[in-house]
Swiss-Prot record:
Region span, Interaction with tRNA: 140-142, 296-297
Protein name: tRNA-specific 2-thiouridylase MnmA
Domain of life: Bacteria
Keyword terms: ATP-binding, Cytoplasm, Disulfide bond, Nucleotide-binding, RNA-binding, Transferase, tRNA processing, tRNA-binding
């Protein structure tokens, strides 16, 4: 079978390529180029992926997606911050770029499947229904970022690392294969944000500085001024610059009115949330059902009740109040170890009975 591997130059995708080659598949490597061709020196994804491909004796391609990445990912990222939301660009990138444009490019190059270094597992029923399941390595599980995959796309992807129990095992494999990136560190940052400094990136590249406004308490009292709503996210405690008898947290961001609303810790908790752009890998059998959900990547799933609404929306009520429900982030639904689907959080539900 001919399999294209999305090669980032890191350990995970390199081991994925090596494992598939060892299994006897015909492998081609594809590296997505999101930035200028000048960004291809030693240590860059393009360079390191090419070195690994040469080591494995496989063909390596560069896929120029600089324009598409800016239009689909960076511009949306900026727009979401302008509107007072906190986006998750990695979820959107997986949907439109990795398992959209890259998947199509792999097929154009004659590949039967696309493999990535994601930590996730898939399974298939006798009737052909595909399932996305959490990885054996729960600490590295990345299914949160993959909830937008459809049945059609799941049929065309493979995750070779899904059954590997630890990152140490992956590095051991990298050494066994003699990969030149075996000791390369993991990337923890959004790829287009230098040093993970969102504020500097937005102000230096996106003209989001200088839009000052008020910081107000939930009781309406004016507490101070801020230098732009893009500097804040729901649940934030540090960096508010406000003296108060108790710790204060960001409770609401109203970008249109240039308001940052803060309150004591109880005000950060929500009874539920509303979400839009909801999609399902496995369609729910009824309009209301019990599930578990995650509202951020590193959060543990919590029990909830989901109610489907018109227009691809849903309402979610938690069994126990949850802290820092953040518009712009994704809510992802699980049944045991299976991903059902997910959507984009648009609002927190703070009180019982709130629509």
């Amino acid at each position: 079978m001919k399999i294209a591997v999305a090669m980032s130059g890191g350990v995970d995708s390199s081991v994925a390529a090596a494992l598939l080659k060892e299994q006897g598949h015909e492998i081609i490597g594809i590296t997505m180029q999101f930035f200028a061709p000048s960004c291809q020196g030693a240590g860059t994804p393009a360079h390191d992926a090419a070195v690994v491909a040469a080591h494995l004796g496989i063909t390596h391609h560069l896929l120029d997606l600089e324009h598409d990445f800016r239009q689909l990912i960076i511009n949306d990222f900026i727009s979401q911050y302008r509107s007072g939301q906190t986006p998750n660009p990695c979820v959107r990138c997986n949907r439109f770029v990795k398992f959209g444009l890259l998947l199509d490019a792999a097929r154009e190059r004659g590949a039967d499947l696309l493999a990535t270094g994601h930590y996730a597992r898939t399974s298939i029923d006798p009737d052909g229904t595909r399932h996305l399941r959490v990885a054996a390595n729960l600490r590295k599980d990345q299914t949160y970022f993959l909830h937008t995959l459809s049945q059609e796309r799941l049929a065309r992807v493979v995750f070779p690392l899904g059954d590997i129990g630890s990152k140490d095992e992956v590095r051991d494999l990298a050494h066994r294969f003699g990969l030149p990136v075996a000791e390369k560190g993991d990337s923890q940052e959004v790829c287009f944000i230098p040093n993970d400094d969102y504020v500097s990136y937005l102000e230096e590249n996106c003209a989001l500085g200088g839009e000052t406004g008020d910081i107000v308490h939930v009781n309406g009292r004016l507490l101070g001024r801020h230098r732009g709503t893009h500097r804040y996210t729901i649940g934030q405690r540090k960096g508010l610059g406000i003296a108060w008898s108790e710790p204060l947290y960001v409770v609401e961001i109203d970008a249109a009115r240039k308001l940052v609303v803060v309150g004591e810790e109880p005000h950060v908790y929500a009874q539920g949330l509303k979400a839009e752009e909801v999609g399902w890998i496995i369609a729910p059998g009824k309009e209301e059902f019990e599930a578990s959900c995650k509202i951020r990547y590193r959060h543990q799933p919590v029990a909830c009740r989901v109610t489907l609404l018109q227009g691809g929306a849903c309402r979610v009520l938690f069994h126990e109040p949850l802290k820092a429900v953040t518009p712009g982030q994704s809510v992802v639904f699980y049944q045991d170890d299976e991903v059902l689907g997910g959507g984009r959080i648009t609002a927190a539900i703070k009180r019982d009975g709130e629509a």
